[in-house]
Amino acid sequence: MANKRLKKKLETKRKKSLLVSEGYSKKETKKLKGRELETVYKKKAHNRKNRERAREIANLAKQWGLSPSKYNSWKKLLPEIERIKKEQDREAPFLLIYYQDFTGETDSKFIYDFKKRNNTRSRSQITESIIGWLQNAHNKLFLGRVAIRIVPKRDVSKTNTLWRNHGYVKIYEGQGKELSKLLTAIETIMVGVYDVKERDKYLKELVAKLRSLPYEKAKKNAKEIQKIYDTKSYKKESWDNDDYY
């Protein structure tokens, strides 16, 4: 019984404390008892909850660059945020790399087989191969050229179709975040382009494109690829270490 009285006393104290925080004087709260206290407390608690919700909605609206007065309820705000997210996703920049062989000897199957082969090779092996091609005066295998483009996600499909219709094979599609896939694309360029100056040009263009993307991972990969381009001595332990990527 004593515990019940203590619990009730503490609950009354908590309610009166809230009323004081809502602007009631201690003198006024002392006069409130029983049902009257409960009625006033519920009203003030409800008002506080509404204010907190309104503040939360307003803060989130501001974070998304929206007007708090216009989007003043979850029902209005959340669908608008979802719409913005979808629009941002459609506008997200994508990096596309295409290759065309002048002789017509390479096709999509060649690229597929090349990528498949690299799935069984370590990064250090692929990197060593790239450095070897960079140091080789001429490639006696293929005569080709490369196109590197950045487009919004909504345009990826039609851009792929456009370049395919011009005889190009896609060798990379993504946001520049996957270093292994980028290395495979680079090695494809090394194998597929005859002149070393042209290979240098494409690699420098790729690094610049990666740096321009709004993704930290892409910028980090640009630095790693630049290191490959600049390196004079190849260290297997370095390129195999996942901490670098």
Curated annotation (Swiss-Prot):
It is found in: Virion. Interacts with the DNA-binding protein P1. The keyword Iron-sulfur does not apply. Keywords: Covalent protein-DNA linkage, DNA replication, Nucleotide-binding, Phosphoprotein, Viral DNA replication, Virion. The keyword GTP-binding does not apply. Disulfide bonds: none annotated. A motif (Nuclear localization signal) lies at residues 4-55. GO terms for molecular function: nucleotide binding. One of its GO terms (biological process) is viral DNA genome replication. The record marks Y172 as: Interaction with the viral DNA polymerase. Transmembrane segments: none annotated. This is DNA terminal protein. It comes from Bacillus phage Bam35c. Its main location: virion. Acts as a primer for viral genomic replication. DNA terminal protein is covalently linked to the 5'-ends of both strands of the genome through a phosphodiester bond between the beta-hydroxyl group of a tyrosine residue and the 5'-phosphate of the terminal deoxythymidylate. This protein is essential for DNA replication and is involved in the priming of DNA elongation. One of its GO terms (cellular component) is virion component. The modification O-(5'-phospho-DNA)-tyrosine is found at Y194.
